[in-house]
Curated annotation (Swiss-Prot):
Pathway: Bacterial outer membrane biogenesis; LPS lipid A biosynthesis. Keywords: Glycosyltransferase, Lipid A biosynthesis, Lipid biosynthesis, Lipid metabolism, Transferase. Belongs to the LpxB family. One of its GO terms (cellular component) is membrane. This is Lipid-A-disaccharide synthase. It comes from the Bacteria. SUPFAM superfamilies: UDP-Glycosyltransferase/glycogen phosphorylase. Condensation of UDP-2,3-diacylglucosamine and 2,3-diacylglucosamine-1-phosphate to form lipid A disaccharide, a precursor of lipid A, a phosphorylated glycolipid that anchors the lipopolysaccharide to the outer membrane of the cell. One of its GO terms (biological process) is lipid A biosynthetic process. The gene is lpxB. It comes from Nitrobacter hamburgensis (strain DSM 10229 / NCIMB 13809 / X14). GO terms for molecular function: lipid-A-disaccharide synthase activity; phospholipid binding. Its EC number is 2.4.1.182.
């Protein structure tokens, strides 16, 4: 492991994160790197508010790249390509000792390839593996040309990289495991989980397109469920930039939810929730770690659905199912995302059913599956970043 000895001169590390989740990872990594290098480090790159609090001045607002959906990407393609060129040029001009790309592979990997072509000696670490195990597995082998090490958030990913002949890959741990204590209930909150009326979480997504696709079907699902299950305490979790859009959407719902915004409110809601209706994604792993049984749903545009049906190679698209290694969480995707399917499944997990018990039993395995030993994920990530940087020839 890397020691904490400061370099003789300040190290320069260029980081690129273009989504909020990557921004949080980058911020935690920056904190540890600064501590390990005794403050003899300068950060440059692209990031959001969390990385800005650690001193990063972003080349451009990451909101420029918060685009989802085939049609939206096509419309914004000239701007995206310009940002890729600008970012690669900025890396070259900065002459850093290390480049760390964080998630968002459609953007960051294009930057990395350009940088590797112009600065072949610059070490590049990829923090958050692309889903090579789910689709386009040939990417793993291709990454060997421009990535020196992959930092994996999921425990099964290193073996997938070995199988696919990709670059070295190390499981450093998912940041969610550092938040487990804030997600799980104390004794009083556990009593609330079991008390009537049941608290049902609704998580339609964090992007505008997801709100557009999910809110109507989720509202109708709750109407159907209420007819059968009776009174419920429905809590809808959303993001600050979506709150007005969400309020407009729920105005027509027969059952009005409490709308919660912010991390503390979300964690408090997780601790007392009996069950959840959620879109697919990382939030399924968060709910599983919190011990909240769930039903998952997802609707996308027609083009995205057509592509997904032809390229996804896994038996489930639910992250929690993949980490557990068992399809315990029901998933209703695209044309199957209907109130007729969702309401009965939710009714089942709200009661003490075999499905609910099976989910809870599977969720209890996650601590052992995702364990990282004595060090936090960001500490393990920093170790490999420093080892890779020290092993390189440095700037040309």
């Amino acid at each position: 492991m890397a020691d904490g000895t400061a370099a003789n001169s300040s190290r320069r590390i260029f980081l690129i994160a273009t989504e909020e989740s990557g921004d949080r990872l980058g911020s935690s990594l920056m904190k540890v790197l600064r501590r390990r290098l005794d403050d003899a480090v300068r950060f440059e790159g692209v990031g959001g508010r969390s990385m800005a609090r650690e001193g990063l001045v972003s080349l451009f607002p990451i909101e420029d790249l918060s685009i989802m959906g085939f049609a939206a990407v096509v419309k914004q393609l000239p701007m995206i390509l310009r940002r890729i060129r600008e970012t690669a040029d900025a890396v070259i001009a900065a002459e850093p000792d290390m480049l760390v790309i964080i998630d968002s592979p459609d953007f960051t990997h294009r930057v990395a390839r350009r940088v590797r072509a112009r600065r072949p000696a610059l070490p590049i670490v990829d923090y958050v593996s692309p889903s090579v195990w789910a689709w386009r597995p040939g990417r793993a082998r291709a990454m060997r040309r421009y990535v020196d090490h992959v930092l994996a958030l999921l425990p099964f990913e290193p073996e997938e990289y070995r199988r696919l002949a990709g670059p070295p890959c190390t499981y450093v741990g998912h940041p969610l495991i550092e938040q487990v204590g804030m997600l799980r209930p104390d004794a009083q909150e556990r009593q609330r989980r079991d008390a009537p009326p049941p608290a049902l979480l609704v998580l339609p997504g964090s992007r505008r397109s997801e709100i557009d696709h999910h809110m109507a079907v989720f509202g109708e699902t709750l109407r159907t469920l209420q007819l059968d299950a009776g009174e419920m305490d429905v809590v809808l979790l959303t993001m600050p930039h979506l709150i007005e859009k969400v309020k407009a959407a729920v105005a027509s719902w027969p059952l009005q939810p409490r709308i919660v915004v912010g991390e503390q409110g979300k964690q408090a809601a997780f601790r007392v929730a009996r069950a959840a209706l959620t879109k697919s994604g990382t939030v399924t792993l968060e709910l599983a770690l919190a011990g909240v049984p769930m039903v998952t749903a997802y609707r996308g545009g027609a083009v995205e659905a057509w592509i997904a049906q032809r390229v996804i190679r896994t038996s489930s698209v639910i992250l929690a199912n993949l980490v557990i290694g068992e399809n315990v969480i029901p998933e209703f995707l695209q044309e199957n995302c209907t109130p007729e399917n969702l309401a009965p499944a939710l009714r089942e997990i709200l009661t003490d059913s075999p499905l609910r018990r099976r989910q809870l039993k599977a969720f209890a395995k996650l601590d052992a599956i995702m364990a990282t030993g004595q060090h936090s994920p960001s500490e393990r990530a920093a170790d490999i970043v420093l080892e890779t940087m020290h092993a390189s020839r440095g700037p040309e």
